[in-house]
Amino acid sequence: FVYSGNFLAEVEVDQIEQTRMVMGIHPTQFSYQLKQGEVFDAPEVVMSYSGEGFSKLSNTFHKAYRNHLCRGKYKLSRRPILINNWEATYFQFDEEKLFQIAKEAKELGVEMFVMDDGWFGKREDDTSGLGDWFVNEKKIKGGLGKLVERINQMGMKFGIWFEPEAVSEDSELYRAHPDWCLAILNRKPNRSRYELILDMARADVREYLFQAMCEVLDSANIEYVKWDMNRNLSDVWSAYFPKDRQGEIY
């Protein structure tokens, strides 16, 4: 399913042994209002079939994505070998610790260093900082550009971690805009992983994330983004939309 939202895939065999496959937007919690003359473009679906087992099915599917859906210079070329600092450091790092990890990895033939969670805002553990997409210069002294330049000078590419849809209640973003989160009226929110989910139905939320991420990505020679999503959607209710349009959110 060429779509990142809630979807349904079904396969059934009827009484005369006909097999039917159906895939599309999941009907649960979905509705979409169309005024006269408006059009709704449903997401595309890619299906793969093989009579030669799962291996052939998987190979056919991979080829379809590489040849027709992937874009950019890595569409058909080998991806760089990368190292990620997450389990080596968790949130406890500074630019020197990151540089040393990259330096040792370079000696082993690794081609890219990816800086994971903890580089932004007041992010000392998983209870704070999400949503504040600006560099923590107590950890990355001199800013992101200086660190990336050092990594590049070793002959390595640089990547960075984001989790754009999530926000911590202990963050500058949440304190400024508590109404930007999905939340069901008069109910306590689900704080899975100490996170809430931003309401992407709001244009101001999308604009904030776009501008904040662009500012980071434009500040240095960043060639890769690890785009994480660590919790499921819940409390799917937008204060921005009226009651009869809540089915457009999920």
Which sequence ranges carry the predicted segments?
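Active-site neighborhood of glycoside hydrolase catalytic domains
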Residues: 136-154, 174-250
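N-terminal accessory beta-strand-rich subdomains and adjacent acidic, glycine-rich linkers
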Residues: 1-65
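Aromatic- and glycine-enriched glycan-recognition loops and surfaces
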Residues: 89-175, 182, 207-211
